[in-house]
UniProtKB/Swiss-Prot annotation:
Function according to Swiss-Prot or TrEMBL: May act as a substrate-specific adapter of an E3 ubiquitin-protein ligase complex (CUL3-RBX1-BTB) which mediates the ubiquitination and subsequent proteasomal degradation of target proteins.
Species name: Arabidopsis thaliana (Mouse-ear cress)
The keyword Ion transport belongs to this UniProt entry's keyword annotation: no
Cystine connections: none
Residues annotated as domain BTB: 24-98
Signal peptide location: none
GO biological process, one term: protein ubiquitination
Domain-level remarks: The BTB/POZ domain mediates the interaction with some component of ubiquitin ligase complexes.
Protein name (database record): Putative BTB/POZ domain-containing protein At2g40450
Pathway annotation from the record: Protein modification; protein ubiquitination
Keywords: Ubl conjugation pathway
């Protein structure tokens, strides 16, 4: 019977491959990276995880390249975010470091969509939902729009409606209204509906309270 340490060694094989850069054949760069902060990776691993990476690496641009090692630049990501992204790709158990997930949930959510890695998107969505509060609900609702993600949109929308008196008085809401007027109208309509259905009539004076 295999011991836990043997299992850990087995599961960590791909991570070791990444760390030791053994037979690495592609260089990954973030938008803020230079040549000294590139991440050396393996095409087969990237292709196995993402159809988008497969299309990139099979494109005419890369096939025609005379370079010994091609570079893929993920310009939308910072180097630290790219490190977390690549580390996830190399994990065979489908998990991600909780600290990395908490810190980079939004950027990884975008990356998961762009590079078509649904499981990572699910993990990021769950983290974002668990962290929802009145101070971040607007930005998370905004994040859920492109592409539209109902599973993230709905709890963010509900959080906003529940805390509308606090949220609507802040400067962030004014900016949100300017950038997303249609969404703002939906929020106000839902808030009015919620308010009207929650009000009761006093039996003595026939006034709402």
């Amino acid at each position: 019977m295999a011991t836990q340490s043997n299992k850990e060694a087995f599961l960590g094989g791909f991570k070791k491959l990444l760390n030791e850069q053994w037979q690495a054949d592609v260089r990954l760069k973030a938008g803020d990276s230079d040549e000294t902060t590139s991440i050396f990776a393996h095409k087969l691993v990237l292709v196995a995880r993402s159809e988008v990476f497969k299309k990139i690496l099979e494109s005419d641009e890369f096939k025609a390249s005379s370079k010994q090692m091609e570079t893929v630049t993920l310009s939308e990501m910072k180097h630290e975010e790219l490190e977390a992204f690549v580390e996830f790709i190399y994990r065979v158990d489908g998990s991600i470091c909780s600290a990395s997930l908490k810190k980079h949930a939004r950027s990884l959510f975008h990356a998961a969509d762009k590079y078509e890695i649904p499981h990572l998107r699910d993990l990021c969505r769950n983290e974002l939902i668990s962290s929802l509060n009145s101070s971040n609900a607007l930005s998370i609702l905004e994040l859920a729009q492109i592409p539209f993600d109902k599973a993230l949109n709905d709890p963010a929308f509900t959080t906003i409606i529940t805390n509308i008196s606090t949220i609507a008085s802040g400067d962030e809401f004014k900016l949100f209204v300017a950038n997303h007027p249609n969404l703002a109208v939906d929020i106000m309509k839902a808030s009015i509906t919620r308010l009207s259905t929650s009000r009761k009539i006093c039996g003595y004076c026939n006034r709402y309270y």
